[in-house]
Amino acid sequence: MRPAQASIDLEALRHNYRLARRLGGSKALAVVKADAYGHGAVRCAQALEPEADGFAVACIEEALELRQAGIRAPILLLEGFFEHDELRLIAEHDLWTVAATQQQVRALAEFQSPRPLRVWLKMDSGMHRLGLSPEDFRAAWLRLRGLPQIASLVLMTHLARADELDCSRTDEQAVAFALTAGGMRAETSLRNSPGLLGWPALRNDWSRPGLMLYGANPFPQHTENTAQLRPVMTLRSRIISVRELPAGEPVGYGARFVAERPTRVGVVAMGYADGYPQFAPNGTPVLVDGQICPLIGRVSMDMLTVDLTDHPQADIGTPVQLWGDAPQVSALAAQCNVSAYQLLCGLKRVPRIYVGEAAVGKLSA
């Protein structure tokens, strides 16, 4: 079997969720959209369900996957519904939905639901992606709040630049949201992962941790709070070939690396088709049996190459760690000019194995 695999530590996931709840001082929806950021939505939700206040996904397909796997906790559709027919499924499967457009508000007002729906009304406070204008937001709240098909309303917005700790935009968004939502008797939801980790003055009834659940730092630097995160995914493989090159010889496509000295080259079974960044530069750290070795040459579809010259003990079969506790996925992403979100969500064919107390408990249940 090809040695590439992603190890998912479910106890670390639970630790990060508890941290999110503690930092928020509120209820927290665990965001498991995009297959839990590449970690496996069903297994992650199963691990978190005993203590999670609920989950959040992008669309009804992701929600139904969780329901079919036996997840009974609340599930919020972050993009709401795309067709009116989905409202029947939302009611049937007891899902919560965001309403972020006039069309969604109108459809909810006209829907004859077999059971009252829980709706999260979204205001655009400055991100300018989804959400109602402040005027339409208040009008929608007035329209929906007394309808028999609406069980409850939560007022929400989304922070656009909370991962920039020196940016005033987050405070401006929070003030705009508070000015509009003030006086509306409803729970609120404002804080995402960077909002929880970096903006302690913000307050809400529901937070929505996503990236932090998986142990990735949303900031370019570490803080007291991010230091408490535990990486959930460890991406591993092994060396599958070793060769000696004389000085002056190139490595890989395009000869991006040329040996300046006699160089011992290790080939690792991991490439961009697996989700490793294709344009990782020469020198990107790779952990070979606990020792950092530099990436050399261009990353191929199925393989990458590392300089083993200073690690003579490494040989075919030696274990390799691409990210995890070291190097951390956020640091690797920054070095490769991509986001940690992109790396985690980009794992396509790497098999996942689950470890940690939650995995043991689930298997023995």
UniProtKB/Swiss-Prot annotation:
GO BP, sorted A to Z: D-alanine biosynthetic process
N6-(pyridoxal phosphate)lysine carried by residues: 33
Record field: catalytic activity: L-alanine = D-alanine
Top enzyme category: isomerase
EC number: 5.1.1.1
Pathway membership, UniProt: Amino-acid biosynthesis; D-alanine biosynthesis; D-alanine from L-alanine: step 1/1
GO molecular function, a single term: pyridoxal phosphate binding
Metal-binding as UniProt keyword: no
Catalytic residues (positions): 33 (proton acceptor), 253 (proton acceptor)
Highest taxon in the source lineage: Bacteria
Keywords: Isomerase, Pyridoxal phosphate
Chain ranges passing through the membrane: none
Residues annotated to bind substrate: 129, 301
Signal sequence, start to end: none
SUPFAM superfamilies assigned to the protein according to its UniProt record, in alphabetical order: Alanine racemase C-terminal domain-like, PLP-binding barrel
Gene Ontology CC entries for this record: cytosol
Required co-factors: pyridoxal 5'-phosphate
PROSITE patterns: ALANINE_RACEMASE
Function: Catalyzes the interconversion of L-alanine and D-alanine. May also act on other amino acids.
Family affiliation: Belongs to the alanine racemase family.
Name assigned to this protein: Alanine racemase
